[in-house]
Amino acid sequence: LILYHFRQEARLSTDCFIFPTSIAATESDIIVCIDDVMMSGGTAQRFFYQNQEDFAEKKIYYLALLSSNEALSKLQELNIKVIPCAVLDERNRVFSEESLCFFKYPALKETAKIMVEGYGKIIEPKKALGHMDGQYCFGFSYNIPNNSLPIFWSSSNGWNPIFCRKEKYQNAKQAKREYGFFI
């Protein structure tokens, strides 16, 4: 969805865009990847490792609406130029020492953390405060990152989220297993 809007605003032809499986066949010396959020950097890092041969001799740019310093560092180590619109830091993590979320009501912070973490452990035991302890509190109209608090998005263990999270399909086989009757 974000790529569609980017293409429309930049008035770019669909010919300028390729599927990841076509990277090796492209003659371009420059590859630009566009993403909404890059918080832990793990997904982007795995993508580049999986396509390392295809990226050889190419200049790689990674555009992201939101990124963390951790994710920036991971990709810069791979010689990838990362261009984020905004970099989130400890101030954006709900329960960090530097968090801006409770600056007006600091006395509520510990009580809120106990409640959020308590429910989080029930609905997402391995990521009670979000993937990689994200502690973020944001989402988009089309999806919500798993780094955000799971009390907002998880539907595990009978929880009814206020926002539905749609998992990404990592490959065509995974999508076909779930939606094969449509294909």
Could you tell me what each predicted segment is?
Residues 30-32, 61:
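Structural motif
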Residues 5, 49-183:
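PRPP-dependent phosphoribosyltransferase catalytic core
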Residues 1-29, 39-46:
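Short, glycine/charge-rich flexible loops or terminal/linker lids adjacent to PRPP-binding catalytic cores
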Residues 35-37:
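Active-site metal-binding loops of divalent metal-dependent hydrolases
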